[in-house]
Regions:
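Basic, Lys/Arg-enriched alpha-helical interface segments
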Residues: 1-88, 97-102, 111-136
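Conserved catalytic cores of phosphodiester-cleaving nucleases, focusing on short active-site segments
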Residues: 105-106
Length: 136
């Protein structure tokens, strides 16, 4: 029930912001979650979900801070970074190169070490490759 309320509030904010931005002629980012990314978010504690969705919303509104949304080195993968109660949540994503304002979130992890696991980056790159192959 709480998830539905949070989602509705987030959608209402997105709708109102999109109306304002359309009137002002501002291009807004759109973040799309894959099923796996959505399942990851749904499995997290409610307060952590709120914080992750809040960070996604901030990026959609154009806040591009490195502590929230960062490009990983030597790759086309980006990560949404959320720290809540000492736990680091990462949501991997990539830009749709045909639509400048579309970001696809592939999957997420709870980060336990300082270094981002290479297998998770490879997984995100594979999903990206699949996405573009299916678009052709």
């Amino acid at each position: 029930m709480k998830n539905r309320i949070l989602y509705r509030r987030l959608e209402t904010k997105r709708y109102l912001c999109s109306i304002i931005q359309n009137k002002m002629g501002i291009n807004k980012l759109k973040v799309v979650l894959t099923e796996e990314a959505q399942a990851f978010l749904d499995a997290q504690p409610f307060k952590a979900q709120q914080k992750i969705y809040y960070n996604i919303f901030k990026v959609e509104e154009g806040v591009m801070k490195v502590d929230i949304f960062k490009k990983l080195e030597n790759t086309e993968i980006w990560e949404f970074r959320t720290l809540y109660n000492g736990i680091c949540y990462r949501l991997f994503s990539f830009w749709d190169t045909e639509e400048e304002t579309l970001v696809i979130a592939t999957h997420g992890i709870v980060k336990k070490t300082q270094k981002t696991p290479l297998k998770e980056i490879a997984k995100a790159e594979e999903i990206r490759k699949e996405y573009f192959n299916n678009k052709k």
